[in-house]
Swiss-Prot record:
This is AP-1 complex subunit mu-2. GO terms for biological process: intracellular protein transport; vesicle-mediated transport. Belongs to the adaptor complexes medium subunit family. Residues 168-421 form the MHD domain. Adaptor protein complex 1 (AP-1) is a heterotetramer composed of two large adaptins (gamma-type subunit AP1G1 and beta-type subunit AP1B1), a medium adaptin (mu-type subunit AP1M1 or AP1M2) and a small adaptin (sigma-type subunit AP1S1 or AP1S2 or AP1S3). Interacts with P2X4. It comes from Rattus norvegicus (Rat). The lineage of its organism: Eukaryota, Metazoa, Chordata, Craniata, Vertebrata. Subunit of clathrin-associated adaptor protein complex 1 that plays a role in protein sorting in the trans-Golgi network (TGN) and endosomes. The AP complexes mediate the recruitment of clathrin to membranes and the recognition of sorting signals within the cytosolic tails of transmembrane cargo molecules. It is found in: Golgi apparatus; Cytoplasmic vesicle, Clathrin-coated vesicle membrane.
Length: 423
């Protein structure tokens, strides 16, 4: 079983949109949702699933809206939540921003989309590219005299339309890796993880087949193979266009791509990663009236690489004032609402070390920090580099017309949840 009805509520719990799919749950049941939500919130027991009698409310919040599905027992909760999040994604594709105003301005389109997204409580067409073929931004409906089925619905390749043409055929490939890191005050790595994605921007005519080859160091956990000195990717997820049977046989990533932007695959890598941008801080207090913080930052990556847009957030006492800064490179500013100094460095070459000194007054002479200081946060982006060593070895583009196409590859390593604890 799946959803009986779907509601979109404003921030006060008033229904803006409702769609009854099965008729087995009274639509008035939604009146119990907001009181239940507020009660659980006051009790500190808020949960994504609320119940009133035999009726269950599965809900998510997006911006100033609540999306709620009602259902009776034995429903597939994970399916319902996936549908709600996919609904948000589709609405954002149509309206850019999903909020109360965009719902009120597009009632007709919203109802049309809800009719196509779900049928008798079960998700149906949730691909926004297919939906946009016959539900337009103007809300034009299909001609009633003719039965016109969008070609992608009957096509074996539902994610790509036929007849696409470009004057210049190109494919842009982005390999992006985010580094999640937690380092203790002694410099030991407590947690480290690489989260990677391979994104494509496709401008190709016709119905091309693409074959993507990664370097030999890369190993996929789901193949069950193992070698030394390999990069073992975990939680590998592919776009629906990838031929999984071909991948299982020879690890070739073969697919007919959607048009435009899409995420081909994502992966995770649990491995010991040293800080690519490291920072150490020393704090000194003088007679409880002033404090001096010295921060040393070091680029621990190849000298030929450069980290761009580096931001180092250094925590300072909550009662600090009268800031003065001295930096060997970049600029520093005090952000009192966050109790941090942000040291910004536009370009940070590998192997370099830089210093920043900050001086503050301390008007509250009685305070002595009891709790530990918050960690230093670091943001950065290193182009032409991946921490895992993953590389695109080749991209073959095969199309029956035989045209030539150019593949472009870009590598980016960036900070994710990147924290360095201080003593």
């Amino acid at each position: 079983m799946s959803a009986s009805a779907v509601f979109i509520l404003d921030v006060k719990g008033k229904p803006l949109i409702s769609r009854n799919y099965k008729g087995d749950v009274p639509m008035t049941e939604i009146d119990h949702f907001m009181p239940l939500l507020m009660q659980r919130e006051e009790e500190g027991m808020l949960a994504p699933l609320l119940s009133h009698g035999r009726v269950h409310f599965l809900w998510i919040k997006h911006s100033n809206l609540y999306l709620v599905a009602t259902t009776l027992k034995n429903a597939n909760a994970s399916l319902v939540y996936s549908f709600l999040y996919k609904t948000v994604e589709v609405f954002c594709e149509y309206f850019k921003e999903l909020e109360e105003e965009s719902i009120r301005d597009n009632f007709v389109i919203v109802y049309e989309l809800l009719d196509e997204l779900m049928d008798f409580g079960f998700p149906q067409t949730t691909d926004s590219k297919i939906l946009q073929e016959y539900i337009t931004q103007q809300g034009n409906k299909l001609e009633t005299g003719k039965s016109r089925v969008p070609p992608t619905v009957t096509n074996a390749v539902s994610w790509r339309s036929e007849g696409i043409k470009y004057k210049k055929n190109e494919v842009f490939i982005d390999v992006i890796e985010s580094v999640n890191l937690l380092v203790n005050a002694n410099g030991s790595v407590l947690l480290s993880e690489i989260v990677g994605t391979i994104k494509l921007k496709v401008f190709l005519s016709g119905m091309p087949e693409l074959r993507l080859g990664l370097n030999d160091r890369v190993l996929f956990e789901l193949t069950g193979r193992s070698k030394n000195k390999s990069v073992e990717l975990e939680d590998v997820k592919f776009h629906q266009c990838v031929r999984l049977s071909r991948f299982d046989n020879d690890r070739t990533i073969s697919f007919i791509p959607p048009d435009g932007d899409f995420e081909l695959m994502s992966y995770r890598l649990s491995t010991q990663v040293r800080p690519r941008v490291d920072x150490e801080s020393v704090i000194e207090k003088f007679s409880h009236s002033r404090v001096e913080i010295m921060v040393k930052a070091k680029g621990q990556f190849k000298k030929q690489s450069v980290a761009n847009g580096v931001e180092i957030s250094v925590p300072v006492p909550s009662d600090a004032d009268s800031p003065r800064f001295k930096t060997s490179v970049g600029s520093a500013k005090y952000v009192p609402e966050k109790n941090v100094v942000i040291w910004s460095i536009k370009s940070f070459p590998g192997g370099k070390e830089y210093l920043m000194r900050a001086h503050f007054g301390l008007p509250s002479v009685e305070t002595e920090e009891v709790e530990g200081r918050p960690p230093i946060g670091v943001k950065f982006e290193i182009p032409y580099f991946t921490v895992s060593g993953i590389q695109v070895r080749y991209m073959k583009i095969i199309e029956k017309s035989g045209y030539q196409a150019l593949p472009w590859v870009r590598y980016i390593t960036q900070s994710g949840d990147y924290q360095l604890r201080t003593s």
